[in-house]
Amino acid sequence: MAGREIGGGDRRWSLRGMTALVTGGTRGIGYAIVEELANFGAEVYTCSRSQNDLDECLEKWRRKGFKVSGPVCDVSSISQRQTLMESVTSSFNGKLNILINNAGTTIPKEATNFTAEDYSIIMGTNFEASYNLCQLAHPLLKASGNASIVFNSSAAGVIAVPLSSIYAASKGAINQVTKSLACEWAKDSIRVNAVAPWIINTPIIEAACQVPSQKKNIESLIGRAPMKRAGEPSEVSSLVTYLCLPTASYITGQIICVDGGYTVNGFI
């Protein structure tokens, strides 16, 4: 099953021979991204804060014939990010084709209830870590001669959503960095894009729906999207993978919403 190609074996639709780093790759959208990239032939390096999650996923991928490896890493830690990139450098001989900044977190609160610690956690994980990983990965991406960065942003970085002011700010910052790096690093043959999902059926959403009040809020938000349903992780990972394929070679600096039409709905 590993190494799928479409388009009659056209190399524009293959990631065979390419290397990728996906942060937070053992759950939800990150897990789907690792599988999709590996299925198109990429050799993937990923990380997780949980050794148990990592071991379980690596075994599943091994059984599927995917080339996936990686360590435990908390990307909010500067020293752990540096160690991660040293491992990537060693594993991929100093070259990296794909960087997926997927790891992220949120704390839902009213704006007046956020603390300095909340701010540090959300911005540190969602923005600082992603930005710094781009800096650390730049020499490897440039050395590959054909590289792509994709940020996992959010519809919350495009329009206002409840209880998410700091999270939205972190994703809005990601969206602007996407545009800035796309322009600054084009000369190095590095493309930079972002995907901006809305509500996706992940373990986090499933857990939240176990609380009646949260389930009601989530269902209300889902109902505002024209497609009237939550998305699936595979519906995000497919776009992420497309943006990394050679066939997307003229696409850079874009923030693409994967939201069932939520951000463009004028009939709310």
From Swiss-Prot:
Pfam family, any one: adh_short_C2
EC id: 1.1.1.-
Active site: residue positions: Y167
Protein's UniProt keywords contain Oxidoreductase: yes
Residue sites binding substrate per the record: S154
GO MF: oxidoreductase activity
Keyword vocabulary terms for this entry: NADP, Oxidoreductase
Membership in a protein family: Belongs to the short-chain dehydrogenases/reductases (SDR) family.
Protein name as annotated: Tropinone reductase homolog
Species of provenance: Datura stramonium
